[in-house]
Every structure is written in structure tokens, then in C-alpha cells.
């Protein structure tokens, strides 16, 4: 079964950092966004396996995210 998780990518001095918003423990880095995305997908798969082995509940998407506009100047 496929489940959607929300990835957040942040530009760093060495490339990109990726994190799953629903599963904050899953954090990766990559030299570019594609590398970071692949690492994040791999890390998520590994975490699913680890959580299943430990009989832990796997986080699922239950949130709504939206952008709000705020005047900054």
C-alpha cells in the first residue's frame, strides 16, 4: 500500500536537506534536490521496516498544509 508523506527541502551550503513533516525523525541530505529526494525515499523505506519490526505505529498523512500570505515589508 502506498501512502503519501510530505517532504520539505531546505537549501544548505552543501546542497539540500530533506525532512518528512509527518515523520520528523526522517532527515537526509543530498548534493542536489534529486539526490536528497532519493535519500529521503530510501530513509523512509528503512524507517517503515524498522517500525514494523518494533511493532510501532507508522505515521500517516493526517494534516492539511497551506501557504498563508503575510506582508513582510
Task: List where the protein language model places each region.
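Structural detector for hydrophobic anchor residues on beta-strands
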Residues: 5, 16, 26-28
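Short aromatic-glycine-(Arg/Gly/Cys) micro-motifs in beta-strand/loop hairpins
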Residues: 9-21
Amino acid at each position: 500500500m502506498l501512502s503519501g508523506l510530505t517532504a520539505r527541502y531546505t537549501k544548505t551550503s552543501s546542497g539540500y536537506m530533506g525532512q518528512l513533516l509527518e515523520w520528523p525523525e526522517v532527515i537526509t541530505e543530498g548534493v542536489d534536490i534529486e539526490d536528497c529526494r532519493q535519500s529521503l525515499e530510501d530513509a523512509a523505506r528503512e524507517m517503515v521496516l524498522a517500525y514494523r519490526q518494533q511493532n510501532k505505529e507508522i505515521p500517516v498523512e493526517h494534516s492539511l498544509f497551506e501557504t498563508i500570505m503575510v506582508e513582510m515589508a
